[in-house]
Amino acid sequence: MFSKFFSLQKAFAAARRRLLILILVLGMAGYAWGPALAARQIPPVALSPTESITFTEAQLARGKQLFNRACAQCHVGGQTYPNPDVTLKLSDLEGATPPRDNVLAIVDYIKNPVTYDGVESLVEYHPNTQLLSEYPRLRNLTDEDLKLIAGYILVQAKTVPGWGGTKSESHSDLSAYL
């Protein structure tokens, strides 16, 4: 009887050791893979009509910082306060003439803004890199800075619910934009 009891006790001890080893291995794997699994999946965006690009978290953070400094006065949450009918949501960017749904097209617009239908130049009116006296925030931005801003806009348009939507949609969670 005692030998049976000790055999069961040994079996339980072995099972307990195996369980502890399994828990330890899974815990270490979770610790090692956790940050990668928790990281936001950044979708690729169009660099041009024929090429795509995937920005890193660091690039998007810099793009966000530049956007907030140079663009957010009029484009909080992807809206356009002077003209709420034309926003920074993807469907509006796609519908412009020429389409502004890629990084290089947004960079071109920031440098040489035109009306939504592409007919008239807005260089004299809309903030841009050429309008030196009226809007200095864009003045010293490099092409790389402009690409980061454009990437931030496009990733937001793809991933943030309400980006460029109505006031209640866009402002339901301001933490996504700040």
UniProtKB/Swiss-Prot annotation:
What the protein does comes down to: One of the extrinsic, lumenal subunits of photosystem II (PSII). PSII is a light-driven water plastoquinone oxidoreductase, using light energy to abstract electrons from H(2)O, generating a proton gradient subsequently used for ATP formation. The extrinsic proteins stabilize the structure of photosystem II oxygen-evolving complex (OEC), the ion environment of oxygen evolution and protect the OEC against heat-induced inactivation. Low-potential cytochrome c that plays a role in the OEC of PSII.
PROSITE patterns, alphabetized? CYTC
Q: Which GO terms describe its cellular component?
A: photosystem II; plasma membrane-derived thylakoid membrane
Q: Does the keyword Nucleotide-binding apply?
A: no
Q: What coarse category fits the chief subcellular location reported for this protein?
A: membrane
User: Where does it live in the cell?
Assistant: Cellular thylakoid membrane
Q: How is the cofactor bound?
A: Binds 1 heme c group covalently per subunit.
Q: Which cofactor does it need?
A: heme c
Subunit-structure text: PSII is composed of 1 copy each of membrane proteins PsbA, PsbB, PsbC, PsbD, PsbE, PsbF, PsbH, PsbI, PsbJ, PsbK, PsbL, PsbM, PsbT, PsbX, PsbY, PsbZ, Psb30/Ycf12, peripheral proteins PsbO, CyanoQ (PsbQ), PsbU, PsbV and a large number of cofactors. It forms dimeric complexes.
Q: Which GO terms describe its biological process?
A: photosynthesis, light reaction
Q: Which UniProt keywords apply?
A: Electron transport, Heme, Iron, Membrane, Metal-binding, Photosynthesis, Photosystem II, Signal, Thylakoid, Transport
Signal peptide positions on this chain:
1-38
Q: Which GO terms describe its molecular function?
A: electron transfer activity; heme binding; metal ion binding
Q: Which family does it belong to?
A: Belongs to the cytochrome c family. PsbV subfamily.
> Is Cytoplasm one of the keywords?
no
- Alphabetical list of Pfam families matching this protein: Cytochrom_C550 (PF14495)
State the species of origin: Synechococcus sp. (strain JA-3-3Ab) (Cyanobacteria bacterium Yellowstone A-Prime)
What protein name is recorded for this chain? Photosystem II extrinsic protein V
Q: Which residues bind heme c?
A: C71, C74, H75, H126
Organism superkingdom: Bacteria
* Membrane topology value: Peripheral membrane protein
